[in-house]
C-alpha cells in the first residue's frame, strides 16, 4: 500500500509539471509573432492537456483502482493522441515551401482505438474489466485491452520515427539558409523525441503490461517520471523562446524570379526573410 501511495505521488509530478507548462504557454499566445507560431502554441496546449489526462490516469491506477476502471477510456485516448499532436508540431515547424494542412488521416487509428476502449467500457461488466486490468487473468477483455495498449506504444514509436525523419529532411532542405544554423538544427526536438520513447514510453508500458523485468525493478517507475518532467520543461522553454525558424512560403514574386532564372536575388531575399523572422522573434 505504501508503495502504491509513493507511486501515485511520483506519477502526479508530471501532471503538475504539464499544468504549469500549460499555463505558461497559454499566457504566451498573445505574444506569438505570427499565425504559424500561434498554431504551434495551440498544438502544444493540446499536448499538455493530454499529458495531464494521461498521468492523472496513472495516479488513479496506483491508488484509486475503481476510479481508474471508469477513467480507462480517457487514459487510453490521451495516450494514443499524444504522439500524433507531437508529430503535428514537428510537421508545422519543419514546413518548407507551400504550407499544407496537417493530414487528418493521422487521427484515424487513435480514433479507432478510442472507440474500441469506449465500446469495452460500455459493454463489458465492471468486475470483468477490473479483473482484466489488475488480476492479469487471461480473457478476451484483457487480450483486447493489452492489444490496444501495445498498438498505442507502437504508434508512439512509429510517430517518433516519422518526426525524426521529417527533421532530417528539413535539415537537408534548409542547408542553404545561413540565417541561424543553431535554431534550424532542431536538436532539442530530436532529443525530446528520442528521450521520451527510450526513458518514458517503454518503461511505463512494461509496468502497465506487467512485464516481469519491470515488476522486479520496484523503483523503476520513479525514474520514468524524470524524463517526462524534463522533456516537458525543455519543450516549454524552447517553444516560449521560439527556438526554431519558420521558413515562409514562396511568394508569387519569388516564383517569378525562379522562372526568370534570378536565383541569386531570390536566395538573398529568402535569407533576409528568415533573418527578419528570427530578429522579430
Regions found by a protein language model. Give the residues of each.
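Hydrophobic transmembrane alpha-helical segments in integral membrane proteins
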Residues: 1-20, 149-153
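Hydrophobic alpha-helical transmembrane segments of multi-pass membrane proteins
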Residues: 14-25, 42-62, 82, 112-120, ...
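Membrane-interface helix-boundary motifs at transmembrane edges
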Residues: 30-41, 92-103, 172-185, 217
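Helix-loop junctions on the outward
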Residues: 53-74, 209-214
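The cytoplasmic-loop to transmembrane-helix boundary for the fourth helix
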Residues: 95-120, 145, 181-196
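Membrane-helix interface motif
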Residues: 119-132
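Interfacial "cap-and-anchor" motif at the non-cytosolic start of specific transmembrane alpha-helices
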Residues: 181, 193-251
Amino acid at each position: 500500500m505504501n508503495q502504491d501511495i509513493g507511486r501515485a505521488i511520483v506519477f502526479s509530478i508530471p501532471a503538475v509539471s504539464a499544468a504549469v507548462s500549460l499555463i505558461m504557454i497559454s499566457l504566451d499566445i498573445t505574444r506569438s509573432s505570427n499565425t504559424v507560431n500561434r498554431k504551434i502554441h495551440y498544438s502544444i496546449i493540446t499536448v499538455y492537456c493530454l499529458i495531464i489526462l494521461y498521468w492523472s490516469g496513472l495516479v488513479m491506477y496506483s491508488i484509486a483502482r475503481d476510479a481508474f476502471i471508469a477513467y480507462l477510456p480517457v487514459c487510453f485516448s490521451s495516450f494514443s493522441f499524444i504522439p500524433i499532436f507531437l508529430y503535428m508540431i514537428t510537421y508545422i515547424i519543419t514546413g518548407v515551401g507551400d504550407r499544407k494542412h496537417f493530414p487528418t488521416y493521422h487521427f484515424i487509428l487513435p480514433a479507432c482505438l478510442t472507440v474500441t476502449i469506449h465500446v469495452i467500457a460500455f459493454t463489458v461488466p465492471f468486475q470483468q474489466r477490473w479483473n482484466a486490468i489488475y488480476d492479469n487473468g487471461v480473457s478476451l477483455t484483457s487480450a483486447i485491452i493489452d492489444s490496444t495498449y501495445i498498438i498505442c506504444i507502437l504508434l508512439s514509436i512509429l510517430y517518433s520515427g516519422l518526426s525524426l525523419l521529417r527533421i532530417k529532411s528539413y535539415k537537408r532542405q534548409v542547408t542553404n539558409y545561413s540565417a541561424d544554423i543553431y535554431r534550424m538544427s532542431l536538436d532539442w526536438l530530436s532529443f525530446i523525441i528520442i528521450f521520451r520513447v527510450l526513458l518514458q514510453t517503454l518503461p511505463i508500458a512494461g509496468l502497465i503490461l506487467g512485464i516481469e523485468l519491470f515488476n522486479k525493478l520496484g523503483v523503476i517507475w520513479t525514474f520514468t517520471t524524470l524524463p517526462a518532467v524534463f522533456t516537458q520543461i525543455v519543450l516549454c522553454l524552447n517553444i516560449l523562446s521560439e527556438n526554431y525558424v519558420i521558413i515562409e512560403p514562396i511568394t508569387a514574386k519569388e516564383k517569378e524570379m525562379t522562372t526568370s532564372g534570378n536565383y541569386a536575388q531570390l536566395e538573398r531575399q529568402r535569407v533576409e526573410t528568415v533573418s527578419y523572422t528570427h530578429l522579430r522573434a
